[in-house]
Amino acid sequence: MITIPITLRMLIAKYLCLLKPFWLRKNNKTSVLLIIIILAMILGVVKIQVWLNDWNNDFFNALSQKETDKLWQLVLWFPALLGIFVLISVNKTWLIKLLTIRWREWLTDYYLNRWFADKNYYFTQIYGEHKNTDNPDQRIAEDILLLISKTLSLSFGFIQSLSMLITFTVILWESAGTLSFTVGGTEWNIQGYMVYTVVLIVIGGTLFTHKVGKRIRPLNVEKQRSEATFRTNLVQHNKQAELIALSNAESLQRQELSDNFHTIKENWHRLMNRQRWLDYWQNIYSRSLSVLPYFLLLPQFISGQINLGGLMKSRQAFMLVSNNLSWFIYKYDELAELAAVIDRLYEFHQLTEQRPTNKPKNCQHAVQVADASIRTPDNKIILENLNFHVSPGKWLLLKGYSGAGKTTLLKTLSHCWPWFKGDISSPADSWYVSQTPLIKTGLLKEIICKALPLPVDDKSLSEVLHQVGLGKLAARIHDHDRWGDILSSGEKQRIALARLILRRPKWIFLDETTSHLEEQEAIRLLRLVREKLPTSGVIMVTHQPGVWNLADDICDISAVL
Protein backbone atom coordinates (compact mmCIF):
# COMPACT_ATOMS: atom_id res chain seq x y z
CA MET A 1 0.00 0.00 0.00
CA ILE A 2 1.34 3.41 -1.03
CA THR A 3 1.51 5.94 1.81
CA ILE A 4 1.30 9.61 0.85
CA PRO A 5 3.39 11.89 3.12
CA ILE A 6 1.24 14.04 5.38
CA THR A 7 2.67 17.30 3.97
CA LEU A 8 1.66 16.20 0.46
CA ARG A 9 -1.79 15.15 1.67
CA MET A 10 -2.24 18.56 3.27
CA LEU A 11 -1.11 20.29 0.08
CA ILE A 12 -3.54 18.24 -2.02
CA ALA A 13 -6.38 19.03 0.42
CA LYS A 14 -5.60 22.75 0.17
CA TYR A 15 -5.44 22.50 -3.62
CA LEU A 16 -8.82 20.78 -3.90
CA CYS A 17 -10.33 23.39 -1.60
CA LEU A 18 -9.17 26.12 -3.99
CA LEU A 19 -10.35 24.26 -7.12
CA LYS A 20 -13.83 23.30 -5.92
CA PRO A 21 -15.55 26.73 -5.94
CA PHE A 22 -15.17 27.14 -9.72
CA TRP A 23 -15.40 23.58 -10.99
CA LEU A 24 -18.22 22.34 -8.75
CA ARG A 25 -20.49 25.33 -9.34
CA LYS A 26 -23.66 25.14 -11.40
CA ASN A 27 -23.96 26.45 -14.97
CA ASN A 28 -20.34 25.68 -15.80
CA LYS A 29 -21.03 23.93 -19.11
CA THR A 30 -18.91 26.29 -21.22
CA SER A 31 -15.77 25.69 -19.16
CA VAL A 32 -16.33 21.93 -19.21
CA LEU A 33 -16.81 22.08 -22.99
CA LEU A 34 -13.52 23.99 -23.33
CA ILE A 35 -11.78 21.27 -21.31
CA ILE A 36 -13.19 18.57 -23.62
CA ILE A 37 -12.10 20.45 -26.76
CA ILE A 38 -8.60 21.04 -25.38
CA LEU A 39 -8.26 17.36 -24.44
CA ALA A 40 -9.35 16.39 -27.97
CA MET A 41 -6.68 18.72 -29.35
CA ILE A 42 -4.08 17.12 -27.09
CA LEU A 43 -4.95 13.71 -28.53
CA GLY A 44 -4.68 15.27 -31.99
CA VAL A 45 -1.17 16.50 -31.18
CA VAL A 46 -0.21 13.00 -30.01
CA LYS A 47 -1.56 11.49 -33.24
CA ILE A 48 0.45 13.95 -35.33
CA GLN A 49 3.58 13.05 -33.35
CA VAL A 50 2.98 9.40 -34.30
CA TRP A 51 2.70 10.42 -37.96
CA LEU A 52 5.92 12.43 -37.67
CA ASN A 53 7.64 9.44 -36.07
CA ASP A 54 6.58 7.24 -39.00
CA TRP A 55 7.65 9.99 -41.39
CA ASN A 56 11.07 10.02 -39.69
CA ASN A 57 11.40 6.26 -40.23
CA ASP A 58 10.39 6.43 -43.90
CA PHE A 59 12.55 9.48 -44.63
CA PHE A 60 15.81 8.03 -43.29
CA ASN A 61 15.15 4.65 -44.90
CA ALA A 62 14.58 6.37 -48.24
CA LEU A 63 17.68 8.48 -47.64
CA SER A 64 19.85 5.44 -46.92
CA GLN A 65 18.49 3.67 -50.01
CA LYS A 66 18.69 6.87 -52.09
CA GLU A 67 15.05 6.51 -53.20
CA THR A 68 14.64 9.93 -54.81
CA ASP A 69 10.93 9.70 -55.67
CA LYS A 70 9.96 8.63 -52.17
CA LEU A 71 12.15 11.33 -50.65
CA TRP A 72 10.33 14.02 -52.65
CA GLN A 73 6.95 12.62 -51.60
CA LEU A 74 8.00 12.76 -47.98
CA VAL A 75 9.40 16.28 -48.35
CA LEU A 76 6.08 17.47 -49.83
CA TRP A 77 4.07 15.66 -47.14
CA PHE A 78 6.01 17.25 -44.28
CA PRO A 79 4.56 20.82 -44.62
CA ALA A 80 1.04 19.35 -44.41
CA LEU A 81 1.89 17.55 -41.18
CA LEU A 82 3.59 20.65 -39.83
CA GLY A 83 0.63 22.86 -40.78
CA ILE A 84 -1.87 20.61 -38.99
CA PHE A 85 0.40 20.44 -35.96
CA VAL A 86 0.79 24.23 -35.77
CA LEU A 87 -2.94 24.82 -36.31
CA ILE A 88 -3.93 22.52 -33.46
CA SER A 89 -1.15 23.68 -31.11
CA VAL A 90 -1.83 27.41 -31.56
CA ASN A 91 -5.59 27.06 -31.13
CA LYS A 92 -5.09 24.80 -28.12
CA THR A 93 -3.02 27.55 -26.51
CA TRP A 94 -5.68 30.12 -27.41
CA LEU A 95 -8.44 28.05 -25.80
CA ILE A 96 -6.35 27.58 -22.66
CA LYS A 97 -5.96 31.37 -22.44
CA LEU A 98 -9.73 31.76 -22.88
CA LEU A 99 -10.35 29.26 -20.09
CA THR A 100 -7.77 31.06 -17.94
CA ILE A 101 -9.50 34.43 -18.13
CA ARG A 102 -12.96 32.88 -17.56
CA TRP A 103 -11.70 31.08 -14.47
CA ARG A 104 -9.76 34.11 -13.24
CA GLU A 105 -12.74 36.43 -13.67
CA TRP A 106 -15.02 34.11 -11.70
CA LEU A 107 -12.50 33.31 -8.95
CA THR A 108 -11.48 36.96 -8.55
CA ASP A 109 -15.13 37.92 -8.15
CA TYR A 110 -15.61 35.02 -5.72
CA TYR A 111 -12.76 36.13 -3.45
CA LEU A 112 -13.66 39.81 -3.71
CA ASN A 113 -17.16 38.91 -2.51
CA ARG A 114 -15.70 36.89 0.37
CA TRP A 115 -13.26 39.67 1.22
CA PHE A 116 -15.90 42.41 1.27
CA ALA A 117 -18.72 40.34 2.82
CA ASP A 118 -19.68 41.50 6.32
CA LYS A 119 -16.75 43.95 6.34
CA ASN A 120 -14.39 40.99 6.22
CA TYR A 121 -11.65 43.07 4.54
CA TYR A 122 -11.54 45.05 7.78
CA PHE A 123 -11.80 42.15 10.20
CA THR A 124 -8.99 40.28 8.43
CA GLN A 125 -6.61 42.95 9.72
CA ILE A 126 -7.62 42.67 13.37
CA TYR A 127 -9.38 39.36 13.88
CA GLY A 128 -8.36 35.71 14.25
CA GLU A 129 -5.21 33.67 13.95
CA HIS A 130 -4.42 34.89 10.40
CA LYS A 131 -4.76 38.62 11.13
CA ASN A 132 -1.11 39.22 10.22
CA THR A 133 -1.45 37.67 6.76
CA ASP A 134 0.63 39.82 4.45
CA ASN A 135 -0.53 41.55 1.28
CA PRO A 136 -4.08 40.28 0.70
CA ASP A 137 -4.08 42.47 -2.41
CA GLN A 138 -1.36 40.28 -3.92
CA ARG A 139 -3.36 37.13 -3.19
CA ILE A 140 -6.23 38.47 -5.30
CA ALA A 141 -4.25 40.28 -8.00
CA GLU A 142 -1.40 37.81 -8.57
CA ASP A 143 -1.80 34.51 -6.74
CA ILE A 144 -5.18 33.73 -8.31
CA LEU A 145 -3.69 34.16 -11.78
CA LEU A 146 -0.65 32.07 -10.87
CA LEU A 147 -2.84 29.31 -9.44
CA ILE A 148 -4.97 29.17 -12.58
CA SER A 149 -2.21 29.49 -15.17
CA LYS A 150 0.05 26.97 -13.43
CA THR A 151 -2.83 24.55 -12.89
CA LEU A 152 -3.90 24.60 -16.53
CA SER A 153 -0.41 24.50 -18.04
CA LEU A 154 0.76 21.72 -15.73
CA SER A 155 -2.47 19.71 -15.94
CA PHE A 156 -2.76 19.79 -19.72
CA GLY A 157 0.99 19.32 -20.03
CA PHE A 158 0.82 16.25 -17.79
CA ILE A 159 -2.11 14.77 -19.76
CA GLN A 160 -0.28 15.35 -23.03
CA SER A 161 2.91 13.85 -21.60
CA LEU A 162 1.02 10.83 -20.29
CA SER A 163 -0.67 10.28 -23.67
CA MET A 164 2.65 10.61 -25.48
CA LEU A 165 4.30 8.32 -22.95
CA ILE A 166 1.79 5.51 -23.41
CA THR A 167 1.77 5.84 -27.19
CA PHE A 168 5.51 5.99 -27.72
CA THR A 169 6.31 3.36 -25.11
CA VAL A 170 4.43 0.91 -27.35
CA ILE A 171 6.27 2.23 -30.41
CA LEU A 172 9.65 2.03 -28.66
CA TRP A 173 8.94 -1.52 -27.47
CA GLU A 174 8.15 -2.64 -31.02
CA SER A 175 10.76 -0.66 -32.96
CA ALA A 176 13.85 -1.22 -30.79
CA GLY A 177 13.60 -5.00 -31.02
CA THR A 178 15.35 -7.45 -28.72
CA LEU A 179 18.81 -7.14 -27.23
CA SER A 180 20.67 -10.47 -27.45
CA PHE A 181 23.98 -11.22 -25.75
CA THR A 182 25.84 -14.13 -24.16
CA VAL A 183 27.21 -14.14 -20.60
CA GLY A 184 29.07 -17.18 -19.25
CA GLY A 185 27.81 -19.39 -22.04
CA THR A 186 24.21 -18.39 -21.43
CA GLU A 187 22.35 -16.50 -24.13
CA TRP A 188 20.19 -13.63 -22.95
CA ASN A 189 17.37 -12.04 -24.95
CA ILE A 190 15.79 -8.89 -23.49
CA GLN A 191 12.75 -7.71 -25.39
CA GLY A 192 11.87 -4.05 -24.87
CA TYR A 193 15.22 -3.34 -23.24
CA MET A 194 15.04 0.31 -24.37
CA VAL A 195 11.82 0.77 -22.40
CA TYR A 196 13.31 -0.78 -19.25
CA THR A 197 16.38 1.39 -19.59
CA VAL A 198 14.55 4.68 -19.97
CA VAL A 199 12.19 3.89 -17.06
CA LEU A 200 15.08 3.13 -14.70
CA ILE A 201 16.98 6.25 -15.78
CA VAL A 202 13.98 8.53 -15.31
CA ILE A 203 13.02 7.08 -11.91
CA GLY A 204 16.55 7.65 -10.65
CA GLY A 205 16.62 11.13 -12.17
CA THR A 206 13.28 12.05 -10.61
CA LEU A 207 14.35 11.00 -7.12
CA PHE A 208 17.60 12.90 -7.44
CA THR A 209 15.78 16.00 -8.75
CA HIS A 210 13.45 16.02 -5.75
CA LYS A 211 16.41 15.66 -3.38
CA VAL A 212 18.22 18.59 -5.00
CA GLY A 213 15.20 20.86 -5.42
CA LYS A 214 13.01 20.27 -2.37
CA ARG A 215 14.24 23.50 -0.73
CA ILE A 216 12.95 25.62 -3.61
CA ARG A 217 9.31 25.69 -2.46
CA PRO A 218 9.82 27.60 0.84
CA LEU A 219 12.24 29.95 -0.92
CA ASN A 220 9.54 30.73 -3.51
CA VAL A 221 7.06 31.51 -0.72
CA GLU A 222 9.60 33.87 0.84
CA LYS A 223 10.28 35.44 -2.56
CA GLN A 224 6.62 36.27 -3.16
CA ARG A 225 6.24 37.71 0.33
CA SER A 226 9.34 39.93 0.16
CA GLU A 227 8.51 41.19 -3.35
CA ALA A 228 4.97 42.06 -2.26
CA THR A 229 6.20 43.90 0.83
CA PHE A 230 8.66 45.96 -1.23
CA ARG A 231 5.95 46.84 -3.76
CA THR A 232 3.44 47.77 -1.04
CA ASN A 233 5.93 50.07 0.68
CA LEU A 234 6.68 51.78 -2.63
CA VAL A 235 2.96 52.43 -3.09
CA GLN A 236 2.66 53.76 0.46
CA HIS A 237 5.65 56.04 -0.13
CA ASN A 238 3.92 57.49 -3.19
CA LYS A 239 0.69 58.06 -1.26
CA GLN A 240 2.52 59.80 1.60
CA ALA A 241 4.87 61.84 -0.60
CA GLU A 242 3.75 65.21 0.75
CA LEU A 243 4.00 64.15 4.41
CA ILE A 244 7.47 62.67 3.82
CA ALA A 245 8.64 65.85 2.09
CA LEU A 246 7.31 68.13 4.83
CA SER A 247 8.84 65.94 7.54
CA ASN A 248 12.22 65.70 5.77
CA ALA A 249 11.90 61.94 6.21
CA GLU A 250 13.48 60.97 2.90
CA SER A 251 16.48 59.24 4.47
CA LEU A 252 14.26 57.18 6.77
CA GLN A 253 11.98 56.12 3.92
CA ARG A 254 14.97 55.41 1.68
CA GLN A 255 16.53 53.21 4.36
CA GLU A 256 13.27 51.31 4.86
CA LEU A 257 13.00 50.60 1.14
CA SER A 258 16.67 49.59 1.03
CA ASP A 259 16.05 47.15 3.89
CA ASN A 260 13.06 45.73 2.01
CA PHE A 261 15.16 45.22 -1.09
CA HIS A 262 17.98 43.70 0.95
CA THR A 263 15.52 40.98 1.99
CA ILE A 264 14.70 40.39 -1.68
CA LYS A 265 18.40 40.22 -2.51
CA GLU A 266 19.16 37.71 0.26
CA ASN A 267 16.29 35.50 -0.85
CA TRP A 268 17.38 35.83 -4.48
CA HIS A 269 20.89 34.62 -3.65
CA ARG A 270 19.59 31.62 -1.71
CA LEU A 271 17.14 30.78 -4.48
CA MET A 272 19.65 31.11 -7.30
CA ASN A 273 22.22 29.00 -5.43
CA ARG A 274 19.68 26.24 -4.91
CA GLN A 275 18.49 26.65 -8.51
CA ARG A 276 22.06 26.34 -9.81
CA TRP A 277 22.40 22.82 -8.44
CA LEU A 278 19.08 21.89 -9.98
CA ASP A 279 20.15 23.42 -13.31
CA TYR A 280 23.42 21.45 -13.22
CA TRP A 281 21.51 18.23 -12.86
CA GLN A 282 18.79 19.08 -15.40
CA ASN A 283 21.36 20.02 -18.05
CA ILE A 284 23.48 16.90 -17.47
CA TYR A 285 20.35 14.79 -17.53
CA SER A 286 18.85 16.27 -20.72
CA ARG A 287 22.14 16.30 -22.67
CA SER A 288 22.92 12.72 -21.72
CA LEU A 289 19.51 11.49 -22.80
CA SER A 290 19.91 13.11 -26.23
CA VAL A 291 22.83 10.81 -27.18
CA LEU A 292 22.18 7.76 -24.99
CA PRO A 293 19.73 6.07 -27.44
CA TYR A 294 22.43 5.98 -30.14
CA PHE A 295 24.71 4.00 -27.82
CA LEU A 296 21.91 1.68 -26.75
CA LEU A 297 20.78 1.01 -30.34
CA LEU A 298 24.29 0.62 -31.74
CA PRO A 299 24.42 -3.22 -31.27
CA GLN A 300 21.07 -3.59 -33.05
CA PHE A 301 22.17 -1.37 -35.92
CA ILE A 302 25.57 -3.05 -36.38
CA SER A 303 24.03 -6.52 -36.33
CA GLY A 304 21.53 -5.46 -39.00
CA GLN A 305 18.43 -5.98 -36.84
CA ILE A 306 17.37 -2.39 -37.55
CA ASN A 307 18.12 -0.12 -40.48
CA LEU A 308 18.87 3.62 -40.43
CA GLY A 309 15.19 4.54 -40.48
CA GLY A 310 14.51 2.17 -37.60
CA LEU A 311 17.44 3.66 -35.69
CA MET A 312 16.10 7.21 -36.10
CA LYS A 313 12.53 6.14 -35.33
CA SER A 314 13.60 4.30 -32.17
CA ARG A 315 15.83 7.17 -31.14
CA GLN A 316 12.97 9.66 -31.54
CA ALA A 317 10.60 7.34 -29.66
CA PHE A 318 13.19 6.98 -26.88
CA MET A 319 13.53 10.76 -26.62
CA LEU A 320 9.77 11.26 -26.51
CA VAL A 321 9.35 8.55 -23.87
CA SER A 322 12.20 9.91 -21.75
CA ASN A 323 11.08 13.54 -22.10
CA ASN A 324 7.49 12.77 -21.17
CA LEU A 325 8.49 10.33 -18.45
CA SER A 326 10.78 13.08 -17.14
CA TRP A 327 7.88 15.53 -16.90
CA PHE A 328 8.35 15.82 -13.14
CA ILE A 329 12.05 16.63 -13.54
CA TYR A 330 11.55 19.35 -16.13
CA LYS A 331 8.51 20.83 -14.36
CA TYR A 332 9.94 20.73 -10.85
CA ASP A 333 10.42 24.50 -10.71
CA GLU A 334 6.83 25.16 -11.77
CA LEU A 335 5.48 22.55 -9.36
CA ALA A 336 7.43 24.17 -6.53
CA GLU A 337 6.05 27.57 -7.51
CA LEU A 338 2.51 26.18 -7.69
CA ALA A 339 2.90 24.64 -4.23
CA ALA A 340 3.98 28.03 -2.86
CA VAL A 341 1.00 29.73 -4.50
CA ILE A 342 -1.37 27.10 -3.06
CA ASP A 343 -0.01 27.76 0.44
CA ARG A 344 -0.42 31.52 0.10
CA LEU A 345 -3.86 31.50 -1.51
CA TYR A 346 -5.20 28.87 0.89
CA GLU A 347 -4.04 31.04 3.79
CA PHE A 348 -6.08 33.89 2.30
CA HIS A 349 -9.03 31.50 1.77
CA GLN A 350 -8.93 30.57 5.44
CA LEU A 351 -8.64 34.22 6.36
CA THR A 352 -11.86 35.12 4.52
CA GLU A 353 -13.75 32.30 6.26
CA GLN A 354 -13.31 33.87 9.68
CA ARG A 355 -16.27 35.87 10.89
CA PRO A 356 -16.80 37.56 14.24
CA THR A 357 -19.86 36.02 15.85
CA ASN A 358 -20.53 38.92 18.22
CA LYS A 359 -22.40 41.76 16.52
CA PRO A 360 -24.91 44.38 17.60
CA LYS A 361 -28.54 43.57 16.89
CA ASN A 362 -29.63 45.12 13.61
CA CYS A 363 -32.21 47.77 14.50
CA GLN A 364 -33.40 50.44 12.05
CA HIS A 365 -35.68 52.54 14.30
CA ALA A 366 -33.25 53.36 17.15
CA VAL A 367 -29.78 53.01 18.61
CA GLN A 368 -30.04 51.32 21.99
CA VAL A 369 -27.15 50.58 24.38
CA ALA A 370 -27.94 48.98 27.74
CA ASP A 371 -25.48 47.77 30.39
CA ALA A 372 -22.78 47.42 27.73
CA SER A 373 -19.01 47.33 27.92
CA ILE A 374 -16.47 47.72 25.12
CA ARG A 375 -13.34 45.60 25.27
CA THR A 376 -10.00 44.98 23.57
CA PRO A 377 -9.36 41.77 21.59
CA ASP A 378 -7.63 40.34 24.69
CA ASN A 379 -10.76 41.15 26.77
CA LYS A 380 -9.47 44.22 28.61
CA ILE A 381 -12.21 46.74 29.38
CA ILE A 382 -12.14 50.02 27.42
CA LEU A 383 -15.59 51.31 28.42
CA GLU A 384 -18.25 49.91 30.74
CA ASN A 385 -21.67 50.73 32.19
CA LEU A 386 -22.80 52.26 28.90
CA ASN A 387 -26.47 53.20 28.65
CA PHE A 388 -28.08 55.51 26.10
CA HIS A 389 -30.88 55.64 23.54
CA VAL A 390 -31.08 57.63 20.29
CA SER A 391 -34.29 58.04 18.30
CA PRO A 392 -34.60 59.12 14.63
CA GLY A 393 -34.07 62.85 14.22
CA LYS A 394 -32.13 63.16 17.50
CA TRP A 395 -28.45 64.05 17.93
CA LEU A 396 -26.27 62.50 20.65
CA LEU A 397 -22.80 63.79 21.58
CA LEU A 398 -20.22 61.29 22.87
CA LYS A 399 -18.03 63.39 25.14
CA GLY A 400 -14.72 62.41 26.72
CA TYR A 401 -10.99 62.95 26.72
CA SER A 402 -8.77 61.75 23.85
CA GLY A 403 -8.17 58.01 24.00
CA ALA A 404 -11.21 57.33 26.18
CA GLY A 405 -12.74 55.01 23.58
CA LYS A 406 -15.25 57.22 21.75
CA THR A 407 -14.12 56.11 18.27
CA THR A 408 -14.10 52.46 19.37
CA LEU A 409 -17.68 52.87 20.57
CA LEU A 410 -18.67 54.31 17.18
CA LYS A 411 -16.95 51.35 15.49
CA THR A 412 -18.98 49.01 17.68
CA LEU A 413 -22.23 50.75 16.74
CA SER A 414 -21.12 50.50 13.07
CA HIS A 415 -20.77 46.69 13.44
CA CYS A 416 -16.99 46.96 13.03
CA TRP A 417 -15.84 46.07 16.56
CA PRO A 418 -16.99 42.65 17.83
CA TRP A 419 -15.41 42.86 21.28
CA PHE A 420 -18.23 43.99 23.54
CA LYS A 421 -20.65 42.64 26.10
CA GLY A 422 -24.18 43.73 26.92
CA ASP A 423 -27.20 44.74 24.87
CA ILE A 424 -26.35 46.88 21.82
CA SER A 425 -28.79 47.51 18.96
CA SER A 426 -27.87 49.67 15.97
CA PRO A 427 -28.54 49.84 12.22
CA ALA A 428 -26.17 47.76 10.09
CA ASP A 429 -26.38 50.26 7.20
CA SER A 430 -25.42 53.41 9.10
CA TRP A 431 -23.20 56.06 7.46
CA TYR A 432 -19.87 56.60 9.23
CA VAL A 433 -17.99 59.83 8.49
CA SER A 434 -14.39 59.92 9.75
CA GLN A 435 -12.06 62.90 10.08
CA THR A 436 -10.03 61.59 7.10
CA PRO A 437 -12.53 60.88 4.29
CA LEU A 438 -11.56 58.52 1.48
CA ILE A 439 -10.82 60.64 -1.61
CA LYS A 440 -9.44 58.79 -4.64
CA THR A 441 -8.16 59.73 -8.07
CA GLY A 442 -10.88 60.14 -10.71
CA LEU A 443 -13.72 62.39 -11.85
CA LEU A 444 -14.78 64.66 -9.00
CA LYS A 445 -18.48 63.96 -9.57
CA GLU A 446 -17.92 60.21 -9.44
CA ILE A 447 -15.87 60.54 -6.26
CA ILE A 448 -18.67 62.45 -4.54
CA CYS A 449 -21.66 60.57 -5.95
CA LYS A 450 -20.39 57.02 -6.47
CA ALA A 451 -21.92 55.56 -3.30
CA LEU A 452 -25.27 57.32 -3.67
CA PRO A 453 -28.43 55.23 -4.12
CA LEU A 454 -29.83 57.53 -6.85
CA PRO A 455 -28.11 59.55 -9.62
CA VAL A 456 -27.48 63.25 -9.00
CA ASP A 457 -27.65 65.87 -11.75
CA ASP A 458 -24.95 68.51 -12.16
CA LYS A 459 -27.21 71.32 -10.92
CA SER A 460 -28.02 69.58 -7.62
CA LEU A 461 -24.38 68.68 -7.06
CA SER A 462 -23.24 72.24 -7.80
CA GLU A 463 -25.81 73.59 -5.35
CA VAL A 464 -24.62 71.30 -2.54
CA LEU A 465 -20.97 72.17 -3.22
CA HIS A 466 -21.80 75.86 -2.82
CA GLN A 467 -23.66 75.13 0.41
CA VAL A 468 -20.67 73.33 1.97
CA GLY A 469 -18.22 76.05 0.89
CA LEU A 470 -16.76 74.36 -2.19
CA GLY A 471 -18.33 76.56 -4.84
CA LYS A 472 -14.97 76.91 -6.59
CA LEU A 473 -15.09 73.19 -7.42
CA ALA A 474 -18.55 73.35 -9.01
CA ALA A 475 -17.02 74.06 -12.42
CA ARG A 476 -14.61 71.14 -12.09
CA ILE A 477 -16.99 68.29 -11.26
CA HIS A 478 -16.12 66.55 -14.55
CA ASP A 479 -12.35 66.98 -14.15
CA HIS A 480 -10.24 63.88 -13.64
CA ASP A 481 -7.46 64.53 -11.12
CA ARG A 482 -5.63 63.26 -8.04
CA TRP A 483 -8.13 64.86 -5.68
CA GLY A 484 -6.74 63.06 -2.66
CA ASP A 485 -3.49 65.00 -3.13
CA ILE A 486 -4.99 68.28 -4.36
CA LEU A 487 -7.64 68.90 -1.71
CA SER A 488 -6.71 70.12 1.75
CA SER A 489 -7.83 68.27 4.87
CA GLY A 490 -10.62 70.80 5.43
CA GLU A 491 -11.80 70.52 1.82
CA LYS A 492 -11.91 66.75 2.12
CA GLN A 493 -14.14 67.09 5.18
CA ARG A 494 -16.44 69.42 3.23
CA ILE A 495 -16.59 66.79 0.45
CA ALA A 496 -17.61 64.21 3.06
CA LEU A 497 -20.44 66.44 4.29
CA ALA A 498 -21.58 67.03 0.69
CA ARG A 499 -21.76 63.26 0.22
CA LEU A 500 -23.72 62.99 3.45
CA ILE A 501 -26.32 65.55 2.37
CA LEU A 502 -26.73 63.93 -1.04
CA ARG A 503 -26.98 60.40 0.33
CA ARG A 504 -29.54 61.22 3.07
CA PRO A 505 -28.85 58.23 5.36
CA LYS A 506 -31.24 57.49 8.23
CA TRP A 507 -28.43 56.98 10.74
CA ILE A 508 -25.15 58.90 10.84
CA PHE A 509 -22.02 58.52 12.98
CA LEU A 510 -19.74 61.58 12.89
CA ASP A 511 -16.19 60.97 14.16
CA GLU A 512 -14.31 64.29 14.36
CA THR A 513 -15.89 65.09 11.00
CA THR A 514 -15.13 68.84 11.21
CA SER A 515 -11.81 68.71 13.09
CA HIS A 516 -9.92 70.48 10.27
CA LEU A 517 -12.42 73.34 10.01
CA GLU A 518 -12.73 76.49 12.09
CA GLU A 519 -15.31 76.09 14.84
CA GLN A 520 -17.80 78.62 13.45
CA GLU A 521 -17.66 76.99 10.02
CA ALA A 522 -18.07 73.57 11.64
CA ILE A 523 -21.19 74.81 13.45
CA ARG A 524 -22.62 76.23 10.21
CA LEU A 525 -22.03 73.01 8.26
CA LEU A 526 -23.47 70.72 10.93
CA ARG A 527 -26.52 72.97 11.22
CA LEU A 528 -26.84 72.61 7.45
CA VAL A 529 -26.74 68.83 7.81
CA ARG A 530 -29.45 68.94 10.49
CA GLU A 531 -31.57 71.22 8.32
CA LYS A 532 -31.22 68.99 5.24
CA LEU A 533 -31.63 65.71 7.15
CA PRO A 534 -34.18 66.44 9.88
CA THR A 535 -35.24 62.79 10.37
CA SER A 536 -31.75 61.32 10.57
CA GLY A 537 -30.41 60.07 13.88
CA VAL A 538 -26.86 61.28 14.60
CA ILE A 539 -24.20 60.22 17.09
CA MET A 540 -21.14 62.44 16.98
CA VAL A 541 -17.68 62.75 18.48
CA THR A 542 -16.02 66.17 18.47
CA HIS A 543 -13.56 68.21 20.53
CA GLN A 544 -15.01 71.52 19.30
CA PRO A 545 -17.03 72.92 22.26
CA GLY A 546 -19.14 75.18 20.06
CA VAL A 547 -20.55 72.15 18.27
CA TRP A 548 -21.73 70.51 21.48
CA ASN A 549 -24.79 72.79 21.61
CA LEU A 550 -26.15 71.11 18.46
CA ALA A 551 -26.71 67.85 20.34
CA ASP A 552 -30.04 66.98 21.95
CA ASP A 553 -28.30 64.81 24.53
CA ILE A 554 -24.78 64.14 25.79
CA CYS A 555 -23.20 60.86 26.89
CA ASP A 556 -20.08 61.65 28.91
CA ILE A 557 -17.73 58.70 28.30
CA SER A 558 -15.40 59.91 31.05
CA ALA A 559 -18.19 59.45 33.61
CA VAL A 560 -18.61 55.73 32.86
CA LEU A 561 -14.92 54.75 33.06
Curated annotation (Swiss-Prot):
PROSITE patterns: ABC_TM1F, ABC_TRANSPORTER_1, ABC_TRANSPORTER_2
Membrane topology: Multi-pass membrane protein
Transmembrane segments: 4-24, 32-52, 71-91, 152-172, 188-208, 291-311
Residue numbers on the Cytoplasmic membrane side: 1-3, 53-70, 173-187, 312-561
Gene Ontology MF terms: ABC-type transporter activity; ATP binding; ATP hydrolysis activity
Record carries keyword Transmembrane: yes
Periplasmic side: 25-31, 92-151, 209-290
GO cellular component terms, A-Z: membrane; plasma membrane
Name of protein: Inner membrane ABC transporter ATP-binding protein YddA
Organism: Escherichia coli (strain K12)
